[in-house]
Amino acid sequence: VDYIIIASLLAVLSWSFVDAVSKLYINRFGKELSSMILLAIGIIPMLLLATAYPYLGNILFLLFIGLVGGLVLFLGYILVYKSVPSGGVSNSYILLEVQPIILILFGIFVLGEHIGMEKAASIILIFIGISLILLSKKFKLDKRLVPALIGNVMWAVYWAIIILAFLYYKNFVLPLLFVRVFGAFFAYLYYKAKPPKNYYKINLSKLEISIIAILILAGLFDGFGNILFAFVSFSNKVVFGSAILSLDPIIIWLIGLIAYHEKITVRQKFGFLVATTGYLLFTLL
């Protein structure tokens, strides 16, 4: 279990870095170009890892999983990145709590993993916390955060699809690689579908180069995080790994407040505390 904990925590740290710096490159390059570069760069660590694993055949299966999973993965990035500039880092990424909840339920009802009543109660607390974050001052749904919510559901679906692919293929590296390649391809098509006049023209100033470097580093960390969580999932520890994964949005929520000075309502603060309490109960009980 120790290596599962280490792998899960390293995945959290990797994704926390990506999420924390995402506002910098999204504001600079836009969601289309940012998604394309991030997905493409993330292929590199997966490709390096794939060289150490044998090819098990069944190319049609890999292409099918790549097509379906890649589309869902791409849609997750575009939708979440649409919310970040207006909804803020804190509130957009606290909705990442949706992912582990869905994956925990997936692990229980589909993969046959088990949790106790205490953990089930903590999941309900996380749901309540997320609901409070999504509501505006007048108890209406904050429309700025709807894309982020849907995007995080998409990411959870992506993981559900690819975990089933791991179990069928008896290997997690090649399905992960194929999905990433197709995701980058869809991001490229989406970017090229824009009118040429709307393409971002990169100006190689010192600021521009630094943000490009951050984006490239984020892509590498994102790919690394995917490899780590894929390994955890392939080890039949989806529920356990997903519970630790819940720490990521809590870290990002605090970074958004401290580093970006984002403003949130009292209700959203309370929602954060409720969701965090649910996470702590899940991991400690």
Where are these regions (language model features)?
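MFS transmembrane alpha-helix packing/gate-lining sites
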Residues: 14, 72, 99, 154, ...
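Juxtamembrane helix-start motifs in multi-pass secondary transporters
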Residues: 31-35, 92, 175-176, 241
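Membrane-interface interhelical linkers
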Residues: 1-71, 77-87, 136-149, 168, ...
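C-terminal transmembrane-helix exit sites in multi-pass transporters
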Residues: 80, 101-121, 137, 250-270
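Small-residue-rich packing faces within the transmembrane alpha-helices of Major Facilitator Superfamily
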Residues: 16, 40-44, 101, 127, ...
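Hydrophobic transmembrane alpha-helices of multi-pass small-molecule transport proteins
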Residues: 41-46, 105-108, 118-135, 267-284
